[in-house]
Each structure stands twice: as structure tokens, then as C-alpha cells.
UniProtKB/Swiss-Prot annotation:
Catalytic activity: (S)-4-amino-5-oxopentanoate = 5-aminolevulinate
GO biological process, one term: chlorophyll biosynthetic process
Record-linked PANTHER family: GLUTAMATE-1-SEMIALDEHYDE 2,1-AMINOMUTASE (PTHR43713), GLUTAMATE-1-SEMIALDEHYDE 2,1-AMINOMUTASE 1, CHLOROPLASTIC-RELATED (PTHR43713:SF3)
Species this chain originates from: Chlorobium luteolum (strain DSM 273 / BCRC 81028 / 2530)
Cofactor(s) annotated in UniProt: pyridoxal 5'-phosphate
The protein's name in its UniProt record: Glutamate-1-semialdehyde 2,1-aminomutase
GO molecular function: glutamate-1-semialdehyde 2,1-aminomutase activity; pyridoxal phosphate binding; transaminase activity
Length: 431
């Protein structure tokens, strides 16, 4: 059994200076028990902690590492930028044009794009733009969907808020909460009712087309099409939050996979190659309202900085050249089938949701299609499962309500190791 002496020491020290000892709540292991593991190095599909233990990584920095950690082309490009170009200028640079051209080529909905520094900035900016263009105040989001930590989104949110059992946050004003309406995921009638009750007042509907912060819940295609039709009828801006699923479930994201085009798209994670980045883009008629061209203000000191753009450009080029998506889907299917076989052997019938290389094993027998069904999962069983997988050298997200990501660097031997560990961990979780 691996020891974590140094991690425990560092966590005690961190708690003196950092709230909760972590810089993002889900990292704290509160829902799975024990102390967080402090990592020292990542390479390919593996991470090594400060105590020298090595883990097969299925977190992938929470999604960005579709090509694994320390990809040689990305690290070489970053080294060149760091030593030959610079880290930031606060001026326009040619790389901004290069990544914008790539994004408009890859993502069906994007005609113009603005770079920002995080997914949260992207979603906040997209909603502000929708409000500015429509002259309306209210937005509709979906229970359990996570769109970053902007005030408008922390009402029945997913991700760390759901993990900690607090889907609403103190500090969100009553007025902000009143302007954020929550519908049920995959339930068009709940959306239509809110639109009817707030006729002419809905600026935007924002949705993760593959929800990744309530576990993994794919939207039904007919549901997304109904949203598209409703927005067209009512003059509502449809926003796809593809910060997590963009460039992950398909090169052009979920909108390519489903064949349904939103008005605005938010992006992040993969387009930074592991560095902080975000972007929002969409129809030219909307994006031309962003300052300095239009009146909707958005700015950022480090937006479009050379390091983040270097990693993003190189990542996108590799994805375009190599088209790893069929192989990533094969790997995801291998794990899904292996887990299913293990459950059959053990007489278990837990739910698996998967889209390509993005998956979740829910400790419930109820089909998971929304927030309400996701929270039927047994988090105590998941905690035992997580601990057993960790002991066997498999690092999963420390929450029942997060995704499991497979990368191009996971080998067949890695996948077989994971399936074997899953069998042991399922026994530990259910005994």
C-alpha cells in the first residue's frame, strides 16, 4: 500500500496559508475521505506524487490533457516561446490570429472569437454579450451544469459545488439569483415553461451539450434540437458551454458530434494544452458587439498571452493532423466493456455514461439523464471505490460527480490494468 507522508505534511502546511489547503475545492478529497495527494511530476498518462508513488492518470488536469502530460511537441514549442519570444507583451501578437483562424476552421458555430484566461471568463463574457445584444436580463441554465464560478452560475451548480453538497453559494445576491432560471436537463417541457413564464425576458440559454460536472450526462439530440428551435422562435441566444467537451468528444466538439449549431460557444481546457486559457466565439453578428468594436465590454491583461497560445495552437495542430478520436473512442469503449463485465461477474448493475473518451461510473442503478438522477448515486460507495483504485495506482477524480478522461497516451496495457483494478475496487465498494 502506498504511503503519503510527505503529502500529509504539505497539506497541513498548505492549510495555514490557503483556504482549505487547496486552490480549487474538489481537490480537497472531502467527499472521498483522506488528504489530497500532492503531485511532483506528470509524464504521458502517469503522475508521480511527492512520496514517489506513481499513478495512472484519468483526471488529465480536469480535461486538458487529451494528448497526455508533457507531450514532446507541446513542450518543445513552449520552450521555444519561453526562450525566444517571451511570456507576455500586453499588445496584439500574430499567434492570436493563428489560433483564431484555427478555431473558426474547426468549430462549426464560430465566425469570430475572443481569447480570455479561463472557462469561467468565457462563460461570463458570453452571457454578458447575450444580454447586451438582446437587451434582456434573465438566463436559463440547467440543474447540475457547471459553467464556472461566476455568480450567475452558482445556482444549482455542478462540479465542486455539487461535490461538497452546496450547489448554491453564499455571496450570490438575490437579484443575481432571480435572473438565473434553472431547467431540468434533457427535459424540454421544463425549458418551455420557463420561457413562457418569462416571455420576452430570456437573453440566453446556456448548456453543456455533454454535461461533465454532474458526472457525465450526454444531452439527447432531440433535446438539443428542440432548444435550437425554441431559441430561434423566441430570439434567445443559445450558448453551448464546450469548455470540457469541446475538442474532446470530437474535433469540433459536441456541436459537430450532434450536428446542432449554437449562437455562441465557450471553450477552454484543451485549447490551452494545460495552461490557463478560455475563449468565446460565435456568429459575427453577435461578436461584433464586443468592445472595442461594440459596446459590450470585455478585457484581460493576459488574454492571448504567448505561452497559452503556443500550447493551444500546437495541441490543435496535433489533433487535426492525427485525428485521434476513433482511437480514443475505442479506448473508452474498452474500459466501459471491461467495467460492465466486472459488474456482471459481481452481480452489480451500476450505470455507466460515456461519450468517446469522457466517462463516468455512477453508483446507482437509476439511468442517469439529469441532475435528479445523478444525485441518486451512492457517494459513500464511490468513496470506497476511489480509495481502492488509488491504492492500486489508478488516480480518478475525487468525486462521484466528475468525469474520467482517457488520453492518447493510455496504452492497452494501461487499460487492462485499469479494468483489473476496477474489479477489486467494485468489491471494496460493495462489501
Amino acid at each position: 500500500m502506498p504511503t503519503h507522508t510527505r503529502s500529509a505534511e504539505l497539506f497541513e502546511k498548505a492549510k495555514k496559508f490557503i483556504p482549505g489547503g487547496v486552490n480549487s475545492p474538489v481537490r480537497a478529497f472531502k467527499s472521498v475521505g483522506g488528504n489530497p495527494i500532492f503531485m511532483a511530476k506528470g509524464q504521458g498518462a502517469y503522475m508521480t506524487d511527492v512520496d514517489g508513488n506513481t499513478y495512472l492518470d484519468y483526471v488529465g488536469s480536469w480535461g486538458p490533457f487529451i494528448l497526455g502530460s508533457m507531450h514532446p511537441r507541446i513542450t518543445a514549442a513552449l520552450e521555444h516561446t519561453l526562450t525566444k519570444i517571451g511570456t507576455s507583451f500586453g499588445t496584439p501578437i500574430e499567434m492570436e490570429i493563428e489560433i483564431a483562424e484555427l478555431l473558426t476552421k474547426i468549430v462549426p458555430s464560430i465566425e469570430m472569437v475572443r481569447m480570455v484566461n479561463s472557462g469561467t471568463e468565457a462563460t461570463m463574457s458570453a452571457v454578458r454579450l447575450a444580454r447586451g445584444c438582446t437587451g434582456r436580463d434573465k438566463i436559463i441554465k440547467f440543474e447540475g451544469c457547471y459553467h464556472g464560478h461566476g455568480d450567475s452560475f452558482l445556482i444549482k451548480a455542478g462540479s465542486g459545488a455539487l461535490t461538497l453538497g452546496a450547489p448554491d453559494s453564499p455571496g450570490v445576491t438575490k437579484g443575481t439569483a432571480e435572473d438565473t432560471l434553472n431547467a431540468k436537463y434533457n427535459d424540454i417541457k421544463s425549458v418551455e415553461l420557463l420561457v413562457a413564464e418569462n416571455k420576452g425576458n430570456i437573453a440566453a440559454i446556456i448548456i453543456e451539450p455533454v454535461a461533465g460536472n454532474t458526472g457525465v450526462i450526454p444531452a439527447k439530440k432531440e433535446f438539443l434540437q428542440a432548444l435550437r428551435d425554441l431559441c430561434d422562435r423566441e430570439g434567445i441566444v443559445l450558448i453551448f458551454d464546450e469548455v470540457m467537451c469541446g475538442f474532446r468528444v470530437a474535433l469540433g466538439g459536441a456541436q459537430e458530434l450532434y450536428g446542432i449549431t449554437p449562437d455562441l460557444t465557450t471553450m477552454g481546457k484543451i485549447i490551452g494544452g494545460g495552461l490557463p486559457v478560455g475563449a468565446f466565439g460565435g456568429k459575427r453578428s453577435l461578436m461584433e458587439n464586443v468592445a472595442p468594436l461594440g459596446g459590450v465590454y470585455q478585457a484581460g491583461t493576459l488574454s492571448g498571452n504567448p505561452l497559452a497560445l503556443t500550447a493551444g495552437i500546437e495541441t490543435l495542430k496535433i489533433l487535426m493532423e492525427e485525428n485521434p478520436y476513433p482511437e480514443l473512442d475505442r479506448k473508452g469503449a474498452f474500459l466501459e466493456a471491461g467495467f460492465r463485465d466486472n459488474m456482471q461477474k459481481l452481480g452489480l448493475n451500476f450505470v455507466q455514461n460515456r461519450v468517446g473518451s469522457m466517462a463516468c461510473l455512477f453508483f446507482t442503478e437509476t439511468p442517469v439523464e439529469s441532475y435528479d438522477s445523478a444525485i441518486t448515486a451512492d457517494t459513500e460507495k464511490f468513496g470506497k471505490y476511489f480509495s481502492s483504485m488509488l491504492e492500486q495506482g489508478i488516480y480518478l477524480a475525487p468525486s462521484q460527480f466528475e468525469a474520467m478522461f482517457t488520453s492518447t497516451m493510455h496504452t492497452d496495457a494501461d487499460l487492462e490494468k485499469t479494468v483489473k483494478a476496477n474489479y477489486v475496487a467494485l468489491q471494496a465498494a460493495t462489501k
